[in-house]
């Protein structure tokens, strides 16, 4: 179970369906955080201007039935940690029956926040028979709740800390054509195209991590499952074997025909420093669809 509390305020203004304004304010509390960081304030504002409602527009371009520009800017919060009550330590019984601390409390944990901005244009032609929507968006997520990097010498681990940030941006395009034939048959055709990128801006990683093993600065791929050695082909000759060092710089358990691992960083030995990220694209940068309605 998870307990939270929220207070929400919302106000809208609409003048002649032409000038639009909306403001939202949320004050939200979560049991994940200590009393000093329990509540977060998350405001947002949105404005819109339907230019096609102006008399000069309808007179000059009667075929251009809709032209609306809108913009929104606001923040949202997340308390999605890997476990509950981050400000409490947890204890367990060790192998000799003693009660010991196994996870240290994080009393400074706070809300993960995301600032989202969107600039949109809505277009309609021929009494909205043909329409398009275009949205440019970006999101900066900060104070992400992540597992901390800790030395195994500590003997315990800590609960999630606010240690990451990620940026997302892109464009969404939608188009639709709707019509009715002379025989009363209605149909519509539509498409959607989306382009986006998620990039990790900040990520807590061990000191001296090689650049090719880092998450920070790379596109976010949820399918990145870890690190692995890179296949360097097969041992094809005796010279090939004698030129291949292991993690100690020596040669062992090696014979013709078996595969070898690549000395990725070219330091003269094959070790954990040659591990490379296992990656896959779980969130494709380009998505699209086409639909027909009758």
Task: State each model region's role.
Residues 1-224, 287, 291:
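Extracellular/periplasmic, surface-exposed regions of secreted and cell-surface proteins
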Residues 161, 178-282:
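Conserved small-residue
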Residues 279-294:
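Glycine-rich, aromatic-lined ligand/substrate-binding cores of catalytic
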